[in-house]
């Protein structure tokens, strides 16, 4: 399966920069998936979870508050205001990421009625790491 280049950027820096087999994004009209050779598009993203399928078939999740994505045949560039990668090498690192993600959710809670879904996906992603 072909790979694509993925960058997730915030005003504070890079959250993810690497290759992926697929990316699932929380679009304004609903979730959508992107594979290599995808048609070009630019669209808004709402609060949700970006799932990144890596070459080893593992999935990394990144919680975002909102942003925009540009897709072309070889790369995906995601620009977001706030994001937290749900990852860590230890239980304490995962717990810190989970706490940071919950703080991000609190900051957007009033703006998004689908926040319960985001919270459930966040908890699921954290459990997969433990």
Curated annotation (Swiss-Prot):
It comes from the Bacteria. InterPro entries: ATP_synth_F1_dsu/esu (IPR001469), ATP_synth_F1_dsu/esu_N (IPR020546), ATPsynth_dsu/esu_N (IPR036771). GO terms for cellular component: plasma membrane; proton-transporting ATP synthase complex. One of its GO terms (molecular function) is proton-transporting ATP synthase activity, rotational mechanism. It is a peripheral membrane protein. Keywords: ATP synthesis, Cell inner membrane, Cell membrane, CF(1), Hydrogen ion transport, Ion transport, Membrane, Transport. It is found in: Cell inner membrane. The keyword Cell inner membrane applies. NCBIfam families: ATP_synt_epsi. Produces ATP from ADP in the presence of a proton gradient across the membrane. Belongs to the ATPase epsilon chain family. F-type ATPases have 2 components, CF(1) - the catalytic core - and CF(0) - the membrane proton channel. CF(1) has five subunits: alpha(3), beta(3), gamma(1), delta(1), epsilon(1). CF(0) has three main subunits: a, b and c. HAMAP family: ATP_synth_epsil_bac (MF_00530). This is ATP synthase epsilon chain. It comes from Sulfurimonas denitrificans (strain ATCC 33889 / DSM 1251). The gene is atpC.
